[in-house]
From Swiss-Prot:
This is Large ribosomal subunit protein uL10. Disulfide bonds: none annotated. Ribosomal protein P0 is the functional equivalent of E.coli protein L10. Keywords: Cytoplasm, Ribonucleoprotein, Ribosomal protein. It comes from the Eukaryota. One of its GO terms (molecular function) is structural constituent of ribosome. One of its GO terms (biological process) is cytoplasmic translation. Component of the large ribosomal subunit. InterPro entries: Ribosomal_protein_uL10 (IPR050323), Ribosomal_uL10 (IPR001790), Ribosomal_uL10-like_insert (IPR040637), Ribosomal_uL10-like_insert_sf (IPR043164), Ribosomal_uL10-like_sf (IPR043141), uL10_eukaryotes (IPR030670). One of its GO terms (cellular component) is cytosolic large ribosomal subunit. It is found in: Cytoplasm. CDD domains: Ribosomal_P0_L10e. Belongs to the universal ribosomal protein uL10 family.
């Protein structure tokens, strides 16, 4: 690409970014490291016409934000760094994230990759012939021959999370057809009508909210009862305890009250 082509491309990014920031009041900041073109196509197909992806030079995107002069976008300006991209959308952020999370690519381990998690080779019959036994022995993997095939006797930890993949680990995992890496577009922050929040918040459903509220009310009620302070949360328990006290007094005094007969009937 010539310098002229690069400049023209940068200007196109600027113009498109400016138009998108003017048109949409909702967008997400995403990263697409190790995401292949087929994944992007599948994600865009699921989005349909409800979302647009913006990729390009950060300097052009920052300039577009600055030139718009919208105070509500000032917090976004500082987030435009690294390999960040933008997804502008019309509908629900949860639907946008759902399409992203459904398009995951499993990948083989390559030399130099950093392990995303602990990787184990489980006990199994590998399907490899006995001539491969020496290879496993060199790695310290206990094996035996079962029906003419190499069997791994006990689980073997190939990589720990954060380890760099070496040639022997990459070769072993490749031979066993183990794909320990998963790559997908990752959503980080979401902007909606001037508010920026973490994408993890959209995974919280109504039931999660109701559960948290119930737990909070129970905690407040317990604390109120323990401190002898009447609050709205503790009121049902205060009324119940007061009724129990009245009932005990009436029973002790051999004095019948209407509520007592109702309880005894139940």
């Amino acid at each position: 690409m010539t310098r002229k082509d690069a400049k023209e491309r940068k200007e196109l990014t600027y113009e498109r970014a400016r138009k998108l920031f003017e048109t949409y009041s909702r967008f997400a900041l995403v990263k697409i490291e190790n995401v292949v073109s087929t994944q992007l196509k599948d994600i865009k197909r699921q989005w349909g016409g409800n979302a647009e992806l913006l990729m390009g030079k950060n300097s052009a995107i920052r300039r577009a934000i600055a030139d718009l002069g919208k105070p509500e976008l000032s917090g976004v300006y500082d987030l435009v760094k690294g390999d960040v991209c933008f997804v502008f959308f019309k509908g629900n952020a949860r639907d946008i994230k759902k399409a992203i999370d459904e398009n995951v690519r499993e990948a083989c381990a390559k030399v130099g990759n950093v392990a995303q998690r602990d990787v184990w080779v489980e006990s199994c019959i590998t399907g490899m012939t006995p001539d491969k036994t020496s290879y496993f022995q060199a790695l310290g993997i206990a094996t035996k021959i079962t029906k003419g095939k190499v069997e791994i006797i006990s689980p073997y930890k190939v990589l720990s999370e954060g380890d760099k993949v070496g040639p022997s680990q990459a070769n072993l995992l490749g031979m066993l057809n183990i794909k320990p890496f998963c790559y997908k577009m990752t959503m980080h922050q979401i902007y909606e009508d001037g508010v920026i929040y973490d994408s993890s918040l959209i995974d919280i459903g109504e039931e999660d909210i109701f559960t948290s509220l119930r737990n909070a009310i129970s905690t407040v009620a317990a604390a109120s009862l323990g401190a002898g302070v009447i609050t709205q949360a503790s009121m049902p328990y205060n009324v119940r305890n007061a009724f129990k006290d009245i009932l005990h007094v009436s029973l002790g005094a051999d004095f019948m009250i209407k509520e007592q007969s109702m309880v005894m009937a139940n």
